[in-house]
C-alpha cells in the first residue's frame, strides 16, 4: 500500500486470502479485477470455461466457483474505476506488440531475407516472419551464431534480397566486424537490436536503453549509418518500413533500437493501410547505366549505382579491402582519401531525411522532458499530469537518434526553463549525444536502470 501511485487504490487484501490459495490464485485475481473493471460476470465465466474446457469438469467447476466468489467479494469492497467505453461498431483493430509491428513493417517494405540467432527480446520478430515465410516468399534462416547471421544477411543483400537481422546487445557484439563490412562494401542491411540490461547476460528478461553509444560507434572505421528508436507500437511499423528504404537508398547499415518493454508491450492499433507502403526495389533495375560500370563510382551525393549480380550484362565487383571505383582493391593513398569522403557524403543526405522529434504539450514549457525510444508514452503522460496541476509542461521525443539535426529542436530546448533527460540507463547517453552534437547541455536527468520500465510516476518522483 505504501507503493501506491497517486489515485491508486487497493483492490485486494488479506481478507481475500482464503479464496486466493495455491492454484486458484490467478482465478481469484481475475474475479476481483473483472468486477473492478465492470466486466459482465457471465462473459468472464464463459471465457474461463473455454480456458478450462479441455480439463477435467471438476477442475473447471472449482475455478468457476472461485471466480464468482472473488467477483462477489470485490463487489462488497465498493471499489471501481472509470467504466470502459463500448467499442465502436464495425471498428476492427489489431492487437500487436512492438516486435509484431517491426516484423509487419519489414514485410511491407518487402523484406526477402532474415537471419537470426535466438536472443531475447528480439526473437519473435524472426518467428513472425517464419509464419509468413511461405505466403510472402521470405527466407528466414536460424544461423549457428550471430556472426553467421549478419554475414548471411549482407551476402543476401549483395545478391539482391532486401535483408535484415534481429538480435540483442550481446548478440550484436558479435556482429560489429560485419557492420564494417556492410559499410565498406556499401551494402544495405537493417539491424534490429532489442536492448536488455547488461553487461554480459545481465537481466535477460528485463528492459534498458544502455546500447545507444555502442550502436553509434560499432564497427571499426568511419562510415555512415542511421539509427531509429521507435517510441510506440505503431512507430515500430513506421520506423521498420522507413529503415529498409533508407538502407537501400544510402547503401549501408540502418539500425532499429528497441528494448524489452516496447518489444513485448501489446496495444490495440488501427490496421495499417499497406497500399500506402510500396516495397523496396533492391538495386538499379531497368535503368540506363553508364559504361564501363563501376560499383563504387564517385558521385556528388556519394551514392553509387548499385546493380545486382546476374541481373545485367555488367560485372559487379566489391571488396572489404579499400578499392577503386570498379571494386578492385587498392592501396593508392589518393583513392583511399576520396573513397572515405565519398562514403561519408551519404551522411549529409541522411541528415536531410532525418525524422523530426515529436513535441507534446505547452509551447513555452517550464518543464520539458526529452526522451528517445520506449520512454515516449511515460514522458507524455508525466507532462499531462503536470499540466493538470497548473504547470506548463511538455515532452520532446526522438524516434530517430542518428543523425541528429540540431536546427530541428534546439529552439524548443532553449525555450524551456528546465530541461530533463529521461532515459533507461545510468549515464544519460542520449543527453551526452545532444551535448556532443549541438553544444546544448541537459543538466537534469531522470534515469532508471533496475530493469523495470520508466513510468510517469517514476518521472514525477524524480522531478520532485
Which residues does each predicted region cover?
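Active-site cofactor/cluster-binding pocket
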Residues: 1-109, 113-115
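Flexible, low-complexity linker and terminal segments
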Residues: 95-103, 107-109, 239, 244-464
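Short gly/pro/ser/thr-enriched loop/turn and capping motifs at secondary-structure boundaries
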Residues: 3-5, 17-18, 123, 147-150, ...
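A short, gly/pro- and small-residue-rich
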Residues: 1-15, 182, 186, 430-447
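Short coil/turn connectors at secondary-structure junctions
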Residues: 5-9, 79, 90, 109-114, ...
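Flexible, glycine/charged-enriched surface loops at secondary-structure junctions
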Residues: 43-44, 56-65, 77-86, 116-117, ...
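Thiamine diphosphate
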Residues: 113, 120-217, 226-247
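Gly-rich Lys/Arg/Thr-decorated short loops/hinges at beta-loop-alpha junctions or inter-strand turns
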Residues: 52, 76-91, 106-111, 130-136, ...
